[in-house]
Curated annotation (Swiss-Prot):
Natural source organism: Dictyoglomus turgidum (strain DSM 6724 / Z-1310)
Enzyme class, UniProt record, top EC level: transferase
Binding positions for substrate per the UniProt entry: T12, G13, T14, G15, K16, T17
Chain spans, region Interaction with substrate tRNA: 35-38
Highest classification ranks of the organism: Bacteria, Pseudomonadati, Dictyoglomota, Dictyoglomia, Dictyoglomales
Entry cofactors: Mg(2+)
NCBIfam families according to UniProt: miaA
Family classification: Belongs to the IPP transferase family.
Site annotation Interaction with substrate tRNA: residues: T101, R124
The name this protein goes by in its record: tRNA dimethylallyltransferase
Transmembrane segments: none
Top-level taxonomic group: Bacteria
């Protein structure tokens, strides 16, 4: 059975959450978060989670599902997301995937499989110590020797992914590129919606977004996590905003320096998101600065329905209550 679903993706700060809630007025949907940071409990401000009020209006999934000290793998995301998608459709509603974590989309839609190798915390600690002593490029060069294909897809300074690739190799004796071979699947009718805006406007919104997070209490949020033992050794604390505020709390940066660093890294991250998403040719891109929210929701609604119908899904009654192929 093929399941019709829609995706709202795009870089941080483009209004994905607002659009998803507005779209819910036109389609009977439940929202599946595709965000690698919103999975963590107690990390609300820095991850820009939908409010509890919004989550009561429209059911949301894969938010607040693990504690910040838990190492959540991409393989786990795929397993949980597929289960949730099937459950949503069984309730006669449509899954609406919303978020900006490119790797999650890639593994969910079967572009490659991820080996389910449990994390080795001791191995990671040793690798981080080696990187601190001899530099990140030392580990990157090692990865290039054992798995050049994977290395070519990872930035030389992306220490987390470099260590993970090395970890998989030393655990199972095979490079991750060999284990994660292409495995395309055809289990969904998919409509992909991408959001963007002019760069100057986007950067201004990103800066305002960071300032708002500080006003909402991001410093206290990070302080509470740190007091519970959550530090930079945990994946959850690698999110932009958290590690910079942690440095402020330790006296390594002033608050102004940490805020400026958050803004700088957020803009850099957005550039990488654009680069990744632009590789895909089957995304319908919308400049959000050109429409009101209601106008955009109507355009996106029609685009989704047309995509589904072009792929063979019979969307029966746009005005009625029966949207399913009964």
């Amino acid at each position: 059975m093929k399941i019709p679903l829609a995706v709202i993706l795009g870089p941080t700060g483009t209004g994905k959450t607002k659009l998803s809630l507005e779209l819910a007025k036109y389609l009977p949907v439940e929202i599946v978060s595709v965000d690698s940071m919103q999975i963590y409990q107690g990390m609300d401000i820095g991850t820009a989670k939908p409010s509890l009020e919004d989550r009561e209006k429209v059911p949301h999934h894969l938010i607040d599902i693990v504690l910040p000290d838990y190492f959540f793998t991409v393989a786990e995301f795929r397993e949980r997301a597929l289960k949730v998608i099937e459950e949503i459709y069984a309730r006669r509603r449509f899954p609406l995937l919303v978020g900006g974590t490119p790797l999650y989309y890639k593994v969910l839609f079967g572009e490659f499989s991820i080996p389910h190798v449990p994390p080795d915390l001791e191995f990671r600690r040793k690798m981080k110590e080696l990187a601190e002593k001899e530099g990140e490029y030392k580990l990157y060069e090692e990865l290039k020797k054992i798995d050049p294909k994977t290395a070519s897809k990872i930035h030389p300074r992306d220490l987390k992914r470099i260590i993970r690739a090395l970890e998989v190799y030393y655990k199972v004796g095979k490079p991750i590129s060999e284990l994660a071979g292409e495995k395309k699947e055809d289990r969904f009718y998919i409509s992909k919606i991408g959001l963007y805006m002019p760069r100057d406007l986007h950067y201004r919104i990103l800066e305002e977004r960071v300032d708002k997070m500080i006003e909402q209490g991001l410093v206290d949020e990070v302080r509470n996590l740190y007091l519970k033992g959550i530090n930079e050794n945990f994946v959850s604390m690698q999110g932009i905003g958290y590690k910079e505020i942690l440095r402020y709390l330790r006296g390594e940066l002033t608050l102004e320096e940490s805020i400026n660093l958050i803004k700088k890294r957020t803009k850099e991250f957005v550039k990488r998101q654009y680069t990744w998403f632009k590789k895909y040719k089957d995304i319908h891109w919308f400049d959000v600065s050109q429409y009101s929210l209601s106008q955009l929701a109507k355009l996106v609604y029609n685009t989704i329905i047309n995509d589904w119908e072009n792929q063979g899904y019979k969307y029966q009654n746009r005005e009625g209550v029966n949207y399913f192929n009964d």
